[in-house]
């Protein structure tokens, strides 16, 4: 099977020349090239910052540090076909949502081509597809056994019978399922489909390990999305990462706005990938996983809560089913927790295979203790009305 990216990416986008400016060639000296305000920021408290200058459009320092970390933690060190990631394999976006939109625009002709999603899944794939007038095809995860794994045979049948599908989105670990999709299943699709790209969204991967990012050097039809919003605790800076072949990363970098990553986002992202802060991220992820198991034990021991969690334990949240799938009770519990106890969780009962389910993010030890107390009190009160 020979993969040719030119058959996937829209021709004008494949040949797109990126925006260039004088700052690409010269970064020091008296900078009079970009029509900036050389007098500095107008807020007095920002006068000593460099915020009157446009940010670095390439972010090479961050890209180099991030790919170095993914290489260090790679599960594929013994696979000779997997090469080290470099900055050339990375494109940055304003959160993963910008990356999702860019990939759809790059590969799918509006009003003609399609994407494939695996519900229950992250809704932004469909939102971005609809905005771009792209049809959404669905192939559900295996919900009957509660595993929420990919039905690879069904997926391949759909892909091989519909040549207009150009992208397949896999959320791993899943949202709202919390289940990591087995890499072997993803690889089977990669090995048997060359008419599009498999996009693996790994927002929660640091809570379970085993990122597919290094595999983009082995499979040219693989794209891996990650973010600093979850394990790194930097949701506020909105920085997403797209790992791809150097060929595809070049195209995505040509498509992006010239200065899409702000100076402040860049500053904090660079701090996040310092060795000491990477260790802190790993330690915090471990604490979250420990608290997740405490929450699981406490909540599934309650009356009116199913004694088995739904989906997986691979993210920073739990999916808990109320009273055998009682959407009415689950929705009341969701509302009462927020309005009476100041605890906001997420009702997910309308998602495929998630009837009666609440998605609960793992908080601090104190927040989780508060949740457990009021969850029990509120649930028992509502169930006995």
Curated annotation (Swiss-Prot):
| PROSITE patterns on file | AA_TRANSFER_CLASS_2
Q: What is this protein called?
A: Histidinol-phosphate aminotransferase
**InterPro entries recorded:** Aminotrans_II_pyridoxalP_BS (IPR001917), Aminotransferase_I/II_large (IPR004839), HisP_aminotrans (IPR005861), PyrdxlP-dep_Trfase (IPR015424), PyrdxlP-dep_Trfase_major (IPR015421), PyrdxlP-dep_Trfase_small (IPR015422)
Q: Which reaction does it catalyse?
A: L-histidinol phosphate + 2-oxoglutarate = 3-(imidazol-4-yl)-2-oxopropyl phosphate + L-glutamate
Q: Keywords in UniProt for this one?
A: Amino-acid biosynthesis, Aminotransferase, Histidine biosynthesis, Pyridoxal phosphate, Transferase
Q: Name one GO molecular function term.
A: pyridoxal phosphate binding
Q: Name one GO cellular component term.
A: cytoplasm
Q: Looking at the record's lineage, which domain of life comes first?
A: Eukaryota
Gene symbol here is HIS5
Q: Which cofactor(s) are needed, names only?
A: pyridoxal 5'-phosphate
Query: Is the Chloroplast keyword given for this protein?
Result: no
**Gene Ontology biological-process entries:** L-histidine biosynthetic process
From the UniProt record, list the coiled-coil ranges: none
Q: Which residues carry this modification: N6-(pyridoxal phosphate)lysine?
A: 230
Q: What is its EC number?
A: 2.6.1.9
Family affiliation:
Belongs to the class-II pyridoxal-phosphate-dependent aminotransferase family.
* Functional pathway: Amino-acid biosynthesis; L-histidine biosynthesis; L-histidine from 5-phospho-alpha-D-ribose 1-diphosphate: step 7/9
Which organism was this protein described from?
Saccharomyces cerevisiae (strain ATCC 204508 / S288c)
């Amino acid at each position: 099977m020979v993969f040719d990216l030119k058959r996937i990416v829209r021709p004008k986008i494949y040949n797109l020349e990126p925006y260039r400016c004088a700052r690409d060639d010269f970064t020091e000296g008296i900078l009079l090239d970009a029509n900036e305000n050389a007098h500095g920021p107008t807020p007095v408290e920002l006068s000593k910052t460099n915020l009157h200058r446009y940010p670095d459009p390439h972010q090479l320092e961050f890209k180099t540090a991030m790919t170095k970390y993914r290489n260090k933690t790679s599960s594929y060190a013994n696979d000779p076909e997997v090469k080290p990631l470099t900055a050339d394999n990375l494109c940055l976006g304003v959160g993963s949502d910008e990356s999702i939109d860019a990939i759809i625009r790059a590969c799918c002709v509006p009003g003609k081509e399609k994407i494939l999603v695996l519900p229950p899944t992250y809704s932004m794939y469909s939102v971005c597809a609809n905005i771009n007038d792209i049809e959404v095809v669905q192939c559900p995860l295996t919900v009957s056994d509660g595993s929420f794994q990919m039905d690879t045979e069904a997926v391949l049948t759909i892909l091989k019978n519909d040549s207009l599908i150009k992208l397949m989105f896999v959320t791993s670990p899943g949202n709202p399922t919390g289940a990591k999709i087995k890499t072997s299943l993803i690889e089977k699709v990669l090995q048997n489909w060359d008419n599009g790209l498999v996009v693996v969204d790994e927002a929660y991967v640091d809570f379970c390990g085993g990122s597919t990012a290094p595999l983009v050097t082995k499979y040219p039809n693989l794209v891996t999305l990650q973010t600093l919003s979850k394990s790194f605790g930097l949701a506020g800076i909105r920085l997403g990462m797209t790992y791809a072949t150097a060929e595809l990363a070049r195209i995505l970098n040509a498509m992006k706005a010239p200065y899409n990553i702000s100076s402040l986002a860049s500053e904090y992202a660079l701090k996040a990938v310092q060795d000491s802060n990477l260790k802190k991220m790993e330690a915090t992820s471990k604490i979250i996983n420990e608290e997740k198991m405490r929450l699981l034990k406490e909540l599934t021991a309650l009356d009116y809560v199913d004694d088995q969690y739904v989906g997986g334990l691979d993210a920073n949240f739990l999916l808990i089913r109320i009273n055998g799938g009682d959407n009415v009770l689950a929705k009341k519990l969701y509302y009462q927790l927020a309005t009476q106890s100041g605890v906001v969780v997420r009702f997910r009962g309308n998602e495929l295979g998630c009837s009666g389910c609440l998605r609960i993010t793992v908080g601090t030890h104190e927040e989780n203790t508060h949740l457990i107390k009021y969850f029990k009190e509120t649930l028992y009160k509502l169930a006995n009305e």
